Amino acid sequence: IVTPVVYSKVLSETIGEQVSLKLENQQTTGSFKIRGAINAISNLTPAQKKAGVVALSTGNHGRGLAYAANLMKIRCIICMSELVPNNKIEGIKALGAEVRLIGKNQDEAQVEADRLSIEEGMTYISPFDNVDVIAGQGTLGLEIHRQMPELKYAFVPLSGGGLICGV
């Protein structure tokens, strides 16, 4: 969904410049990650849709992918470490995905995601290293440009890099 941009009086007064915020927390799954997930799922071939998708996630990418896969009736497995909070696990399950809890860190969970991709032919959808995910995240930048054509600077959070690559 198109999310609003709102003026932040507190931040603007703090730094002495006009600051506006893009409210991606108002997305259906609570974050921008749904943008990339929907785009990636939409670009799967019929054979990929039949085999299903798999991803590694600590929460938001998994929620977005689970939501998108459920919309298209595609099998979805999200691999997570055993240290991920239960509310994130349950949130992903509630959106129709299977969750596999593997190991004490994301590297160990990644091994299971890779195995499913190789052995079961599932399509691995990275939260940041996937051209369709990055293009989907880029819709956020396009919206900002339409909503604020006079914008001079954009500050984009950086974790895996998928959002900033798209924007």
Q: Which residues fall in each region the model found?
A:
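PLP-dependent amino-acid enzyme catalytic core
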Residues: 1-167
